[in-house]
Amino acid sequence: MTDNALRETIIRLAQPVVHTLGLVIWGVETARAGRTIVRLFVDVPTIPQRPGMPEGSEEPSSAITAPAPAHDPQESSGAEAPAAPTSATIEQCEEISRHLALALEVEDSIADAYVLEVSTPGLSRLFFSLEQMIPYVGDVVEARLHTPVASTDPAAHGGPRRVWRGTLVAVEDDAFVLAPVTVSPEGEVEDENQPPVRLPWEAVRRATRMYIFKKPQKPGKKPGKPQGKEVPKGGSGSTAPKKAAAKKKAGRTAAEND
């Protein structure tokens, strides 16, 4: 079974239980390293909103929504409704994993040994379509390409790159645009002062949102803190014995000269 066929099978088998739990399938990733690894990512339903779309506009017909919840009599009584979940829970991922593993066993979809992983996309999420990138305009994205791509702007310096990192500034029908940046190991983001680069989606091998974690600064000495021991006021300090010894030595020298 090809990777594309395997991903389609995983989506078909997982969709019923995922939908029942009020979640959506974010994407499926497969890898073959000795044995097949299948990663299913599930998330809470969101409505992508293109930049410039006014708030409160009608939901597009292609958007995926969760099943309508049953009417709660407490809503009419003025009770405060619980906050909407922001991510799938561990228990939900475990339940999806059990159902999906059983379905794969019944259909014998994967002949060889395999590893099944069900999780949320996380903060550094992998994008499986351009539509998924729309809510993350303004975030830093890393794009790994099949072949090196150079900026088409004549003002750009540097050659083609296989890996681009930049702030996501626009999402088009068949491409997305990054403003190149550099990210230091300490989590500092600096603009490369280059024109934005347009990356066709078909040229992208892997695109992920970069979660920038700034390392905390190490605690240092307070500014203006004196070095060594503080000399007490009034001239009585560690230097006083040295002065007294110097005077005594000078007295002995004068007596010897006499």
Swiss-Prot record:
Keywords per UniProt: Cytoplasm, Ribosome biogenesis
InterPro entries attached to this UniProt entry: Ribosome_maturation_RimP (IPR003728), RimP_N (IPR028989), RimP_N_sf (IPR035956)
Classification lineage: Bacteria, Pseudomonadati, Thermodesulfobacteriota, Desulfovibrionia, Desulfovibrionales
Main location: cytoplasm
Function comment: Required for maturation of 30S ribosomal subunits.
Signal peptide segment: none
Subcellular location as annotated: Cytoplasm
UniProt keyword 4Fe-4S present: no
Disordered, as annotated region: 48-88, 212-258
UniProt record similarity statement: Belongs to the RimP family.
Name recorded for this polypeptide: Ribosome maturation factor RimP
Any single Gene Ontology cellular-component annotation: cytosol
GO BP term, pick one: ribosomal small subunit assembly
Pfam families in alphabetical order: RimP_N
Biased composition (Basic residues): 215-224
